[in-house]
Amino acid sequence: MALKSYKPTTPGQRGLVLIDRSELWKGRPVKSLTEGLSKKGGRNNTGRITMRRRGGGAKRLYRIVDFKRRKFDVEGVITRIEYDPNRTAFIALVTYTDGEQAYILAPQRTAVGDKVVASQKADIKPGNAMPFSGMPIGTIVHNIELKPGKGGQIARAAGTYAQFVGRDGGYAQIRLSSGELRLVRQECMATVGAVSNPDNSNQNLGKAGRNRHKGIRPSVRGVVMNPVDHPHGGGEGRTSGGRHPVTPWGKPTKGARTRNKNKASSKLIIRSRHAKKKGR
């Protein structure tokens, strides 16, 4: 999909760059694969804001996407590629030979009519899913499981991918787009190819209202708040904060490491994504 830039006939169109979605399905999603979705407004079960800058936005239906890909050795055909308001990637409707339908993340370089399959050892072509044990080294993958059978958790956003770079005991080594090198079990599933919609990051929404349609509210800087609201708040006139940048809860921000050093998953990370900053 290409990008569309607009002639500024209105102020909101000046600088506007959007994704051309003309080739996507224009109808409604499959009803049996959708659920209702209520707005949380960034609040948890106690009603407190746990995620700032959330609220409002257009109504959505949740599309049930198959991240597990455990329907082995049953071939499916991509019937259509659809827009999904709940994620940056596009989704593909797959119709299997036994009549079942499912949504999967649409990979790049796939089109309507392409065949996909999940198997212990499948062809290396975009959309096919298999465990790392049946995959050749060097394959570009997305929708990667961290625990066998849990469903894909890594490389699911638009344009993302990881590379399968080696085997180590019962583990597969993968290099993520952040630069991190980590291990996952060889039984974990992954889908061949990169995720669709790589131009997502090149969009320019042109006006604040488009972000509001997405349910994103304005970001207020801590330095313009009162002392009760933020560690950077207060002071007479404009002040520059007076301390190292911190979050509203006093944790260092702007690059300081705050990850717990005793996390169990640390032993599976061979090379940190921050290693290149340290000159390693």
From Swiss-Prot:
One of the primary rRNA binding proteins. Required for association of the 30S and 50S subunits to form the 70S ribosome, for tRNA binding and peptide bond formation. It has been suggested to have peptidyltransferase activity; this is somewhat controversial. Makes several contacts with the 16S rRNA in the 70S ribosome. One of its GO terms (biological process) is cytoplasmic translation. Pfam families: Ribosomal_L2, Ribosomal_L2_C. Signal peptide: none annotated. One of its GO terms (cellular component) is large ribosomal subunit. One of its GO terms (molecular function) is rRNA binding. SMART domains: Ribosomal_L2, Ribosomal_L2_C. Residues 254-280 have a biased composition (Basic residues). This is Large ribosomal subunit protein uL2. It comes from Dinoroseobacter shibae (strain DSM 16493 / NCIMB 14021 / DFL 12). InterPro entries: NA-bd_OB-fold, Rib_uL2_dom2, Ribosomal_uL2, Ribosomal_uL2_bac/org-type, Ribosomal_uL2_C, Ribosomal_uL2_CS, Ribosomal_uL2_dom3, Ribosomal_uL2_RNA-bd_dom. Residues 223-280 are annotated as: Disordered. Keywords: Ribonucleoprotein, Ribosomal protein, RNA-binding, rRNA-binding. Part of the 50S ribosomal subunit. Forms a bridge to the 30S subunit in the 70S ribosome. Belongs to the universal ribosomal protein uL2 family.
